[in-house]
C-alpha cells in the first residue's frame, strides 16, 4: 500500500529529496500536456489508481509475446484488438513489428480521467466520478485509503467536481497519439473486457497484464475468457502476456487459436502465462454473475 501523502519532486530542498527520495513523486500533472515527453508521461500516469489498479506501464515489456506472433501468424489485413492497452506504450512496440495489418484497436476501460482545479489544487476523478487523486503545489495525495486525505481535501474535491470547466484527459502516451494522427488504422475505444466485443470480429486479441489472479478470481477470469472466445471467429487467435512478480521470472506469454468452442495452444514462451490453465478451460460454459 502506498503512503497516502507524498512530496512532489523538485518542490523541496534538494538535500531533503536526496535523503528521503522514496517519499517523493514526479508531478502527475504532466499528463495534462499532450506534448509531454513520453517517458515522463508514463511515469506521471503511474500515480493514477483506477479500477483498483495503478496505471503502470512501459515500453519493451512483452518481447516474448511479440515474438510468438511474428513466428506463428501472418497478420496481413488482420483486425487486432489490444485489450487493457493502458497508455499504448506496449502497443507501439508491437506495431513496430507489424506490416500490412488491417486495423489496430486499443481497448481499455479507463482511457480517460477527469481533471478540475480548485483553489490552486488539481483534482482527478475516474470515469465514474470517483475522486482518485489531489495534487497541490508541494504534495500529492490519494484519498482511497486515507481518511485523513478525505478529511483534508474532500470539500475541495466536491467543489472541483462541480465546476463547469472540468475536462476529460486522454490517457494515451504522446507517441501513440502522434501515431494515431497519421495512421487512421490505429484507434482507441473505451471497453470492458467482461462485455461482448461490439466491433468487427478480431483476427487477434491481445491481453497483457489484465486477466491476473492479482485482480480477479478464477471464475471472473474464466468469464472474461469466454467473452473473448465468443468474440473470435473460428481460427482467430488470443495472445496472453504477463509480467510476473516472481523474482527472476522473465515476461511470459502464450498464443492460442480458437478451434470450435475452445482455445488450442499454438505456442508459449519457456514459462507459460499465469492463466494458461484457465485458457485451457475456457468455453466450459461457466459464467460469472458478478
Model-derived features: positions:
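Conserved SAM-binding loop of SAM-dependent methyltransferases across substrates and taxa
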Residues: 87-100
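A short acidic, Gly/Pro-enriched loop at the edge of an enzyme's catalytic core
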Residues: 194-205
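Conserved class I S-adenosyl-L-methionine
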Residues: 77-87
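A short SAM/SAH-binding and catalytic strip from SAM-dependent methyltransferases
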Residues: 203-218
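Class I SAM-dependent methyltransferase Rossmann-like catalytic core
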Residues: 20-76, 113-121
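Class I S-adenosyl-L-methionine-dependent methyltransferase module
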Residues: 2-13, 19-35, 99-183, 194, ...
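A short glycine-rich, Lys/Arg-flanked "PGG" loop and its adjoining helix->strand segment in the class I
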Residues: 220-234
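Conserved beta-strand signature within the Rossmann-like core of class I S-adenosyl-L-methionine
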Residues: 235-242
Amino acid at each position: 500500500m502506498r503512503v497516502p501523502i507524498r512530496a512532489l519532486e523538485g518542490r523541496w530542498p534538494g538535500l531533503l529529496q536526496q535523503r528521503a527520495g522514496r517519499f517523493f513523486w514526479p508531478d502527475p500533472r504532466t499528463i495534462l500536456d499532450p506534448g509531454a515527453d513520453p517517458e515522463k508521461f508514463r511515469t506521471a500516469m503511474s500515480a493514477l489508481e483506477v479500477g483498483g489498479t495503478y496505471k503502470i506501464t512501459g515500453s519493451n515489456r512483452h518481447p516474448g509475446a511479440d515474438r510468438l506472433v511474428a513466428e506463428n501468424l501472418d497478420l496481413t489485413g488482420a483486425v487486432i484488438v489490444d485489450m487493457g492497452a493502458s497508455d499504448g506504450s506496449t502497443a507501439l512496440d508491437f506495431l513496430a513489428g507489424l506490416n500490412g495489418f488491417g486495423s489496430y484497436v486499443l481497448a481499455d476501460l479507463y482511457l480517460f480521467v477527469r481533471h478540475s482545479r480548485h483553489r490552486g489544487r488539481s483534482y482527478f476523478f475516474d470515469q465514474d466520478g470517483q475522486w482518485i487523486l489531489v495534487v497541490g503545489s508541494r504534495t500529492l495525495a490519494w484519498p482511497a485509503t486515507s481518511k485523513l486525505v478525505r478529511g483534508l481535501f474532500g470539500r475541495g474535491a466536491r467543489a472541483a467536481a462541480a465546476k463547469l470547466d472540468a475536462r476529460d484527459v486522454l490517457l494515451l502516451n504522446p507517441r501513440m497519439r502522434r501515431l494515431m494522427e497519421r495512421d487512421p488504422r490505429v484507434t482507441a475505444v473505451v471497453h470492458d473486457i467482461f462485455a461482448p466485443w461490439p466491433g468487427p470480429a478480431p483476427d487477434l486479441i491481445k491481453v497483457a497484464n489484465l486477466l491476473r489472479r492479482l485482480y480477479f478470481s478464477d471464475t471472473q477470469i474464466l468469464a472474461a475468457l469466454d467473452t473473448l472466445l465468443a468474440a473470435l471467429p473460428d481460427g482467430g487467435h488470443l495472445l496472453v502476456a504477463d509480467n510476473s512478480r516472481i523474482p527472476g521470472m522473465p515476461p511470459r506469454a502464450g498464443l492460442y487459436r480458437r478451434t470450435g468452442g475452445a482455445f488450442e495452444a499454438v505456442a508459449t514462451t519457456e514459462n507459460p502465462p499465469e492463466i494458461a490453465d484457465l485458457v485451457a478451460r475456457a468455453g466450459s460454459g461457466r459464467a460469472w454473475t458478478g
